[in-house]
Design a protein with these regions (language model features):
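Short, glycine/small-residue-enriched coil/turn segments at secondary-structure junctions
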Residues: 1-9
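Beta-strand signatures of extracellular beta-sandwich domains
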Residues: 9-15
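A beta-strand/beta-hairpin structural motif
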Residues: 16-79
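Short beta-strand-to-coil "C-cap" segments at the C-terminal boundary of structured domains/repeats
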Residues: 80-84
Length: 84
């Protein structure tokens, strides 16, 4: 499984619970550096390269009370996460 401090390439699709796609992004990140929301950081450490997981993230493990420019505050989200 992926280790803290390991650099990985991820593909992440973030959706509202109604299925509306909000963000589709590919990134290189370092696991455990808090570069991602808490829900993603926790799941990454349980995954292996090539795996895909579906995460249902409550707002407090996602973008919280502030949200982002495209994600409203207090949004519960579905995240499809792949380690490439």
């Amino acid at each position: 499984s992926v280790q803290v401090g390991q650099e990985v390439a991820i593909h992440m699709q973030i959706k509202k619970l109604n299925g509306q796609l909000l963000l589709d992004t590919k990134q290189h990140i370092k696991v455990g550096e808090e570069e991602q929301i808490r829900a993603v950081e926790k799941v990454l450490q349980m995954m292996r390269t090539g795996e895909q997981m579906q995460i249902i993230a409550p707002w407090y493990t996602a973008y919280g009370i502030n949200g982002t420019d495209i994600i409203e505050p207090y949004s519960n989200l579905e995240i499809i996460l792949t380690i490439e």
